[in-house]
Regions:
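Compositionally biased, disordered extreme N-termini, encompassing classical targeting presequences
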Residues: 1-2, 74
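Amphipathic, hydrophobic secondary-structure cores in small proteins
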Residues: 6-58
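C-terminal edge-of-domain segments
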Residues: 57-74
Length: 74
């Protein structure tokens, strides 16, 4: 089980900033689950995290959110 960060209702770019801060707290290779609203957050946050070099995988979609798994890279 890995930590979960619920960012539903958080606007861009704050949801990306909060995700990055949480990633800074975990070790390289560790995982973080992030819940994001559909729309812009669902598109922008994973894209930005991938550009930072992290591995991002969509775990599933809820009625009002998407769940992603982020593996921290160095």
């Amino acid at each position: 089980m890995f930590p979960t960060l619920d960012l539903r209702g958080t606007s861009c770019p704050l949801n990306y900033v909060r995700t990055r801060l949480e990633l800074d707290r975990i070790g390289v290779g560790e995982e973080l689950e992030v819940w994001l609203d559909h729309g812009e957050p669902e598109e922008q946050v994973p894209r930005s995290l991938r550009m930072d070099g992290h591995h991002v995988e969509v775990l599933g979609h809820g009625d009002d959110h998407v769940r992603i798994r982020v593996v921290r890279r160095g």
